[in-house]
Amino acid sequence: MTRSKFTSQGIKSKHAKKLKKQDYTVFSQKLGYTFKQPDLLQEALTHRSLGFPNNERLEFLGDSVLNCAVSTLLFKRFLLLPEGDLTRLRANFVNQDALHQLASALGIGELILLGDGERKSGGHQRPSILANAMEAIIGAIYLESGFEKVDQVIVALYDPLLNQLDPDLFGKDPKTLLQEYLQSRKVDLPEYSTLLTRGDAHAQVFHVECVIPEFAIRTSGEGTSRRRAEQEAARRAYKLAVVRH
């Protein structure tokens, strides 16, 4: 089997939509990795709204690879950090928000291949879709070049994020940060409510609101689970609270 002609499922891609050569070149430069098999990258960027094959299997693989690589990176970088803090810190770096941030920096939203309906509804900007594509790309690199190479790519991608870390905030998720900040100012804890749930049962997207009445702050978040949506809303509320108060 000639891999360059096949997807990770071993089936020739029949999708009419293709990546443009110029887009492929620019993306490779940003990513710091050039795919030897462009069809594999195309699969990683193909949303399930286009049918099969799509990037869901590569996303599954990339999720495991990313967790292993980030765990190793944090273990080596923060030698004195205890297991509990390392676990929470890793969660912050492999969650939807972090992956969406990486995907946006790479311009994945402009490259993602979507069905017409999904694109018209703004799918190319949806955090969950971009985060999933980021994981799929990581899975594709691993499949093509092995762990050592994908680990190098992941370290390069995460270095800027690690350099921005405030040591006092290690291992704390947005909801915890917001709660501690409000408690330090003797303000009532935020109120979370689900505004909307859309999508099929196996692929739901939650829209959650975070309200801090005393600060007149009202933010929203979106995620593939209620918890992820709450974390996103809390992250935005925390940023506003720190700036205003």
From Swiss-Prot:
Cofactor section: Mg(2+)
RNase III domain boundaries: 24-146
Enzyme class per UniProt: hydrolase
Molecular function GO terms recorded: double-stranded RNA binding; metal ion binding; ribonuclease III activity; rRNA binding
Domain DRBM: 173-243
Entry-linked InterPro entries: dsRBD_dom, RNase_III, RNase_III_dom, RNase_III_sf
Chief place where the protein resides: cytoplasm
Keywords tagged on the record: Cytoplasm, Endonuclease, Hydrolase, Magnesium, Metal-binding, mRNA processing, Nuclease, RNA-binding, rRNA processing, rRNA-binding, tRNA processing
Signal peptide as annotated in the record: none
Keyword Hydrolase: yes
Active site (catalytic residues): 63, 135
EC assignment: 3.1.26.3
Keyword Disulfide bond applies: no
Domain of life: Bacteria
Localization terms from the record: Cytoplasm
GO biological process: mRNA processing; regulation of gene expression; rRNA processing; tRNA processing
SUPFAM superfamilies: dsRNA-binding domain-like, RNase III domain-like
Catalytic activity entry: Endonucleolytic cleavage to 5'-phosphomonoester
Residues bound to Mg(2+): 59, 132, 135
Similarity section: Belongs to the ribonuclease III family.
Quaternary state and interactors: Homodimer.
Function: Digests double-stranded RNA. Involved in the processing of primary rRNA transcript to yield the immediate precursors to the large and small rRNAs (23S and 16S). Processes some mRNAs, and tRNAs when they are encoded in the rRNA operon. Processes pre-crRNA and tracrRNA of type II CRISPR loci if present in the organism.
Protein name in the entry: Ribonuclease 3
Organism: Nitrosomonas eutropha (strain DSM 101675 / C91 / Nm57)
